[in-house]
Amino acid sequence: EGYSVTQRRIIITGVQHDFENIKLAPEPEAGAEVMRQYTRAANSAMTIAAWLHHEGWEARPLTGPMASTLTMIPAAIAAGFGELGKHGSIINPEFGSSFRLSAILTDAPLPLSKPKSHGVDDFCSACRVCEDACPPFAILPEKKTVRGIKKWYVDFDKCLPFFNQHQGCGICIAVCPWSRPGVGLNLAEKLERKRNRVN
């Protein structure tokens, strides 16, 4: 179970979807947008890896979920890229959940970043937008304990048949309030002010 990684650092990159295309999910235009952004994410990982190689460091690009043995969501959360949302995807304060990831494994001595909270957990607890929009009702209203960790959970036994039947979906990321252009950073600031008042 697992494999060994010799590189000590991981760089996470994210490229944002065009909202006008992704909001059409599950239509083919949204699927094409996802593929365009996977391509952009892969190109960014390869460009960064090539630069690191040029600088004398080992670097291995990981260009998407089907081209890598690394699960990027846990790495992205650990790197502070975002938090897990109710819909099972990362929510980044700037991009919402409307983006695609790539990564680069490297031995370059880069500074480490840490997980960051921008209020997603509290927000998702009170929000039902993705849950109500999900045609197969795969998004659970409450967290579930999975492998000893209580977290947001998507029932993939419900999600995947719908996803496969429509050759993709993405409704949950398209309707997420964080994904609307210009909303995420303002929402994160508002939630931060609210947390500071409570503390």
Predicted features by range, described:
Residues E1-I171, V175-R197:
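Catalytic cores of enzyme domains
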